[in-house]
């Protein structure tokens, strides 16, 4: 009786788990998205997000064949980390053919996922959640897992920000300081893979890049300091995701596309606003500059 009265009086309270999940994904997406844009590995992130369908399909097939019940997110994370390490090795060893090899991993990963999914007896509703996102159905166990991964990503970023900063702007400088470029690059890609899986729960595989890239692109128009870009990106992610959830709930729209549209409108608006700094002001995506932290 009391719970129904509270739901009727404050309908948005039932969305509290959804807002918490969006908050965690927004923070991780804003922070890691900054490294991704500055390092110019957006295409790598896109290939991971789409090729991860292979890990999802394999996980669902194993669940069906062995009659197991476990969180599909774990299979997605294992697949994402494996793909990140493969792509990292490709980047470091075959840079001249990086684009073609990334496209190969992108398409092959999706093909493997589709093959495994086709072997399932019935269509699995969780697949739609991974493709298009369905944060409205987040469970307490989902929140715990997202919280753990969020703390893991942010903790490593706090400890290793200086190394990541040097890696993003000058790999040779990192090597000259007796730091393993391969180690730090792999770690950056692994954190990116974990963040991608977190964002998939909010936006889905198809629309995830809008939450990872567009807020950073907007922030780069108003600042060139990495920490400030991260802060602005996190705020934009929170604003767009919370607004998108409320709009989707009120208008009965899907949440992921609603958030993606808000991100796109925000980026379009930023293009129309006069830049606060002189056009000659260096941007963090320019590899030749020595940026402030």
Swiss-Prot record:
BP terms from Gene Ontology: response to zinc ion; transmembrane transport
Protein's cellular compartments: Cell inner membrane
UniProt keyword terms in alphabetical order: Cell inner membrane, Cell membrane, Membrane, Transmembrane, Transmembrane helix, Transport
Entry coiled-coil feature ranges: none
Predominant cellular place of this UniProt entry's protein: membrane
Membrane topology: Multi-pass membrane protein
InterPro entries xref list: ABC_BtuC-like, ABC_TroCD
Positions of transmembrane segments: 12-32, 41-61, 68-88, 101-121, 140-160, 183-203, 253-273
Keyword Transmembrane in annotation: yes
Cellular component GO terms, alphabetical: ATP-binding cassette (ABC) transporter complex
Function of the protein: Part of an ATP-driven transport system CPn_0541/CPn_0542/CPn_0543 for a metal.
Protein name from the UniProt record: Probable metal transport system membrane protein CPn_0543/CP_0209/CPj0543/CpB0565
């Amino acid at each position: 009786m009391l719970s129904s009265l509270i739901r009727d009086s404050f309908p948005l309270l039932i969305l509290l788990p959804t807002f918490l999940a969006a908050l965690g994904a927004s923070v991780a997406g804003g922070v890691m998205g900054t490294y991704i844009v500055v390092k110019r590995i957006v295409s790598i992130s896109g290939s991971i997000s789409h090729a991860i369908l292979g890990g999802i399909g394999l996980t669902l097939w194993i669940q069906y064949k062995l009659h197991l019940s476990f969180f599909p997110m774990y299979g997605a994370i294992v697949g994402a980390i494996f793909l990140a390490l493969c792509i990292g090795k490709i980047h470091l060893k075959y840079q001249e053919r990086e684009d073609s090899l990334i496209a190969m991993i992108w398409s092959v990963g999706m093909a493997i996922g589709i093959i495994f999914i086709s072997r399932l007896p019935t269509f699995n509703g969780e697949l739609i959640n991974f493709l298009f996102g369905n944060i409205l159905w987040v469970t307490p166990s989902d929140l715990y897992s997202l919280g753990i991964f969020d703390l893991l990503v942010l903790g490593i970023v706090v400890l290793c920000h200086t190394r990541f900063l040097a890696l993003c702007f000058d790999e040779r400088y990192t090597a000259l300081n007796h730091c393993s470029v391969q180690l730090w690059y792999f770690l950056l890609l692994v954190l990116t893979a974990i963040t991608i899986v977190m964002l998939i729960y909010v936006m889905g595989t198809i629309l995830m890049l809008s939450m990872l890239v567009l807020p950073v692109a907007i922030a780069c128009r108003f600042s060139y300091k990495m920490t400030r870009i991260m802060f602005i990106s996190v705020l934009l992610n929170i604003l767009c995701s919370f607004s998108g959830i409320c709009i989707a709930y009120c208008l009965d729209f899907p949440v992921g596309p609603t958030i993606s549209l808000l991100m796109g409108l925000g980026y379009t608006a930023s293009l129309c606003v006069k830049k606060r700094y002189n056009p000659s002001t260096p941007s963090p995506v320019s590899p030749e500059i020595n940026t402030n932290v």
